[in-house]
Amino acid sequence: MFNIVLVHPQIPQNTGSIGRMCVNADCSLHIVKPTMFEISDKTVKRAGLDYWHLLDVHVYENLEEFLTIHHDKVERFFFATTKTKKPYFEASFQAGDFLFFGGESTGLPMDLMQLKWDNAITIPMGKNGRSLNQATSAGVILYDAIRQNFSAFEMV
């Protein structure tokens, strides 16, 4: 239904949790290297529990490879970032959209987000907050996208 894109993820447990969520939400997971861990790392699979073998996962050597393959879908790229004021719930998501999340300590590259800056979105936080955990952020935004497209969501 949707595509989660992790650009340079750093924490294997987050990637594993997001992978598990993708299986449960009928989404594809795209991982853009470099990563700070091996995709086959046991901590990734442990966090993904027994779902990992069910995951539709695509791994790219770098951002250039990802963009070469998906260049025709830029209009449907959405970028989770703290660098915008536009809340995620003002976005209009469609099945097939790509939801991007950056590395836990680095975020997304600005040049990537500038491909479609109008689709940069944020999760509102209180004055003392800086950012949410990557897996939490992915869940918040993904499930709002599903809510907006619930009639197309196939539940078990």
Q: Model regions: which residues?
A:
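Post-transcriptional modification and biogenesis factors for structured RNAs
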Residues: M1-V156
